[in-house]
Amino acid sequence: PYRSVSKGDTVSFGSYEQDGNTSNGPEPITWIVLDKIDGQLLLLSADVLEARQYHHVPFEEVTWENSDLRAWMNGNFYEGAFTPVQRGLIETVHNENADQSITGASGGAATDDRVFALSETESVIYLNTPAARSDIGAAPASVHAAAGPLSVSEDGTADWWLRSPGTYGFATQFVDATGVPSLSGANVDLQYGVRPALWINVEGIGEGSR
């Protein structure tokens, strides 16, 4: 079913608690197809699935490589949201983590990730028009995510983390509830929304490079 999809389509892949009712089990995750390159799809969760800190230590300079958010995405989320067969479709990608474009705050070392938050560069590419910011950038928070310490707008949307540094090393960029990226960022210990991103190989099972 994934081979025929186009950029901008939505697909269902994996499952995660979203409706706030754990007794009925996790709900299928809906993803937006941000890109399609050589039989591989870049997926971004359509909704804010969780509220989490980027890192738990206030005012500690931290990059994506050593962040709590990266550990959670590639640990508990990856292992819990996808079946073994689905995990076989998820590519391990080599992410370059560029410095902040204005202040030069360090983006840290390159990382090999199965699941990741989008970068400043990716936000520029995929949220480059008002339509993209409203259609893709502004993300509704799931009932589960909104039940925590997440600030949710009147429209039901929430701020969500990128992985790139903000003005300082203890701040991280995010996309606000209206879909507009914030270069200056927010302190890493704040509870912001999480929208996992990943590449899947729709040509077959197994790892590779994009």
Regions found by a protein language model. Give the residues of each.
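Collagenous Gly-X-Y triple-helix signature in extracellular proteins
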Residues: P1-R210
